[in-house]
Amino acid sequence: MHVRAPWSLPEPTLAYFPNARFVPSDRDLGAGALRLVGEDCPAPTRGGVAVADGPTEPGFNDFHHVPVLAQRCVELLRPALTRHHADGSEAVLVDATIGAGGHAERFLTELPGLRLIGLDRDPSALEIVRTRLARFADRVTLVHTRYDGLASALTELGYGAAQSIDGALFDLGVSSMQLDQAERGFAYSKDAPLDMRMNPQSALSAADIINTYDEAALADILHRYGEERFARRIAARIIRRRADKPFTTTAELVALLYEAIPAAARRTGGHPAKRTFQALRIAVNDELGSLRSAIPAAMDALAVGGRIVVMAYQSLEDRIVKRVFADAVASRTPMDLPVELPGHGPRFRSLTHGAERADAAEVERNPRSAPVRLRALERLELEALPRQGTGKGES
C-alpha cells in the first residue's frame, strides 16, 4: 500500500523508507465517497470486523498514489479474474492492502464487471480510498481490518474462507501518507509523539515498548526486526535513560540513538535511527506475524485457477513470502513414486521465476518500485499427475 504526497520527504526519511517516493500524478481522484459502515451510526462488529460499503459525504485529504508494478499485477491476475467473463463479472478480487486504491482503481477500470473487496487497518487510508473509488461504489466493499483478518472478513461478507475468491493482491510496505502525518510518529526526521500505530485504535504504541519492555526484550526486537547490530548497546542506553524520564517523542529517541551508535557506524551505515524505527514499527503493528497468517489465509481462499500476487519491499517480508510459496509449490508425494498421490501434489504453481524486480523503465517512472520483490502463484487442481523427470521407471 503506497500513497503519494505532493511534496518530498526529507532525505533522512527516504533513507529509512526507500520505498517512499513521490511522482507527479494527473489522476482526478473524484469527489464522491464510499461510506464506512459505523462512521456515523452504530454497526455490527461481527468478529471485530467493521464493514465499509455504500455512499457518504466526501472527506478527503489530497494525497495521490502511483501504484507499483500495476501493469504487471494486471497481467498476472487477469487470467484468473476473466475465467468466467471477459469483463470480470462473477470474479472477486481481494486487495488486502488497499491503501489509497491505486491498484484497485486500475483493476476496476479495466474489468467493469469485477467485484473488489479492499482491506486496510488504517481508518485514514479507508477515508481516502472510499473517495477515490466512489464511481465504483456498487462493486467495492471496504473492510477495516488487518490483512490477517482476510478469512474473517470473507466469512462475514458471505463468501466463505475457502475457495471463494479469484484473486488476491498484497502490496506490502509503509504508506508514505502515514509517514507524512507527523503525529503518527513513523518518520524519525520529524519530532512527533512516539506512536507508530498503523491503526490509531490499537493499544500498543512505540512509547509503550520503549518505556515498559525489559532490556532483553528490547534488544531482541531491535535485532530481530531491525537487524540492528548495536541492539544490546541501544537497549542498555534506553533502560538507563528511561529511569530518569520516560520517552515520549521521536526526537528524544533519535537523540539517544545518535549517542548509542558509534561514530564510525554513523558515518557509514545510513541514518542511525533507521533500523530501530523499523524494528519498533514492525513490533507495534505485528507486521510479520500478521503476514505469516495472511498469506496462507489468502491462498486457502483462492478457488482453483485463482491467483495471488505479493509485493514485498524489505527482506524480512520477502523471506516469509518465499517460504510460504515454496511450500505451496512442493509435492508431498515420495520422490520414488512415478505418479502424484491424490491430494499430495503441489497445491500451487509459480507464475514468476523467483522474485521479479522492477525494470529500469518502471523505476524511472516510479522510483518507489526500486526495492520491490514480486512473487505470484496460481492454485491447481489436486489430481494424480505423471511425475516429470524423477521416480521409478525413469530411463
Curated annotation (Swiss-Prot):
Keyword field: Cytoplasm, Methyltransferase, rRNA processing, S-adenosyl-L-methionine, Transferase
The reaction(s) this protein catalyses: cytidine(1402) in 16S rRNA + S-adenosyl-L-methionine = N(4)-methylcytidine(1402) in 16S rRNA + S-adenosyl-L-homocysteine + H(+)
Enzyme class: transferase
Full protein name: Ribosomal RNA small subunit methyltransferase H
Stated family: Belongs to the methyltransferase superfamily. RsmH family.
Enzyme nomenclature, EC number: 2.1.1.199
Lineage: Bacteria, Bacillati, Actinomycetota, Actinomycetes, Mycobacteriales
A GO MF term: rRNA (cytosine-N4-)-methyltransferase activity
Residues given in the record as S-adenosyl-L-methionine binding sites: 101-103, 120, 147, 171, 178
Protein species of origin: Mycobacterium marinum (strain ATCC BAA-535 / M)
One GO biological process term: rRNA base methylation
